[in-house]
Amino acid sequence: MSLVHINILMAFTMSLTGLLMYRSHLMSALLCLEGMVLSLFILATLTILNSHFTLANMMPIILLVFAACEAAIGLALLIMISNTYGTDYVQNLNLLQC
């Protein structure tokens, strides 16, 4: 395993740790989730480029499209929640009321 792969896996684990530790605000959780998806995108791209598997060249592009959709939906939910409740604290949200 090369140093680049180790750094990308470390970025993924740091984003996962950030998601688990800083989940009081919705914005910080969304940023950590975006970091996880982007590190997975880079790891998938490097793996496909190193393996020279030509049939899977579309997988990183599909993953990038899903990351963009996830970011757009997350920001729309953040705006809706902050307009409705006046804050972005995750503790104030109740799934039974939403």
From Swiss-Prot:
GO terms for molecular function: NADH dehydrogenase (ubiquinone) activity. It is a multi-pass membrane protein. It comes from the Eukaryota. One of its GO terms (biological process) is ATP synthesis coupled electron transport. Keywords: Electron transport, Membrane, Mitochondrion, Mitochondrion inner membrane, NAD, Respiratory chain, Translocase, Transmembrane, Transmembrane helix, Transport, Ubiquinone. Core subunit of the mitochondrial membrane respiratory chain NADH dehydrogenase (Complex I) which catalyzes electron transfer from NADH through the respiratory chain, using ubiquinone as an electron acceptor. Part of the enzyme membrane arm which is embedded in the lipid bilayer and involved in proton translocation. Core subunit of respiratory chain NADH dehydrogenase (Complex I) which is composed of 45 different subunits. This is NADH-ubiquinone oxidoreductase chain 4L. It comes from Monodon monoceros. The lineage of its organism: Eukaryota, Metazoa, Chordata, Craniata, Vertebrata. The gene is MT-ND4L.
